[in-house]
């Protein structure tokens, strides 16, 4: 990495050339962190893992329109590439792939895309139809673009906060036989427990205070202090918070199960106009 920060590639051809060149010059492994930018400390932890565990660390920054449904925040989603680059420079990331929509989808919406199936139609997928299809499609494309070739380990890093997305990415890799290893990274939280998210910056101070109910309720539920229904009522009773779902699932399949050891509790709620998610193992 240069002393001025990561090299920014805006075209597929350029980032491919850089990866191929650096592998040829001795990089023995490649780590990829796919993001939509608006990076926070949670992303920094993911990027640091990619940096520490690989010779070449690559971060993609692309606000993917396929992941946003009608009425969602695609146009207003924060875009702050210079700030993102400053954070990634501190970590020591080597390459940043920051294409525009035309570069990734030159013909508009792709004719061929990845579908998430039944596991992508529940929980987040029920509220945000098509979201996971869009996420899988772009990451599938990123894997194809970035893969260094046989013989060079290729690892991709995903946060456990997006538990459903993580499971679907793991399934896609298995189903498509991608030469990439998915490495999960634990949730990063604020000092008071709020899961870090790019959308947290939408919250007022008062809303951020109310949002803490998500973490505190998950802790009470996983400790056996609340039933599932009591946990739902507790979240919904919080001012400015509107519950979307609070469920416990088998983390391997996303099938709904009772709140029992080994299950995963997932919550999604609107805090004011901002939608937040969180999860915790029982």
Where do the model's predicted regions map?
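Nucleotidyltransferase catalytic core that binds NTPs
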Residues: 2-240, 249, 253, 273, ...
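A structural signal for short secondary-structure junctions
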Residues: 239, 258-261
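Active-site lining segments that contact anionic ligands and/or coordinate catalytic metals
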Residues: 243, 262-264
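Substrate/ligand-engaging "lid" and interaction regions
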Residues: 246
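Short, basic/aromatic-enriched C-terminal tail that caps enzymatic domains
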Residues: 255-257, 264-282
